[in-house]
Amino acid sequence: MCAKKRSASSNRWLQESLKDKYVVQAQKKGLRSRAWFKLDQIQKSDRLFQPYMTIIDLGAAPGSWSQYVTTQIGKNGHVIACDLRYMSPLSGVDFIQGDFCNKQVLQAILQRLENKKAQVILSDMSPNFSGKPEIDIPKSMYLVEKALKMCRYLLIPGGTFIVKVFQGDGFYEYICSMHALFNTVKIIKPDASRSRSREVYLIAKGHKI
């Protein structure tokens, strides 16, 4: 019975993907995933990325967000991407494989920054989903809390943090934690985000020290 349910769910996801206009466009444009369009829509509404910026992309694989920001910050900008999974090389992206909370990995990021800090930190991370919100939401909150913690070490005063969060237990408490570190926090759901998904994006501006 469980196998049948998983099979039906997988088939439904596959059929949705085949019909998804963003999946089709991503394939035509040679993009790494449809998530590229989510960040593009965020950029068009908020104009967060500028030439020469240094940007850190946490949980970057397969690399669509890193791929996008390289088009916005120019050749003199700097993208540092980090993920537990391997990510195939991208022009203009400095990739570090590992857990960014690991001391050695964090040190590697700091070395790439050359004693500076980033203007923007991105996090589009998701856990491996089980399909059970009571399991998946806490796993997701654990990841976004780790990403928020990194802002203390890696983000400039006045900097911006963009993070994907799944609505559920701990969501509003997390927003309160963000308000403690940033001047403003905005909730946005890009059109490219599937309507049935619990995911939203939080844009936090004005990093406090």
Curated annotation (Swiss-Prot):
Identify the Pfam families for this entry: FtsJ (PF01728)
Q: Which GO terms describe its cellular component?
A: cytoplasm
What EC number(s) are associated with this protein in UniProt?
A: 2.1.1.166
Bilayer-crossing regions: none
Top-level taxonomic group: Bacteria
Q: Name one GO molecular function term.
A: rRNA (uridine-2'-O-)-methyltransferase activity
Instruction: Just give the chief location class.
Output: cytoplasm
* Family statement: Belongs to the class I-like SAM-binding methyltransferase superfamily. RNA methyltransferase RlmE family.
Q: What is this protein called?
A: Ribosomal RNA large subunit methyltransferase E
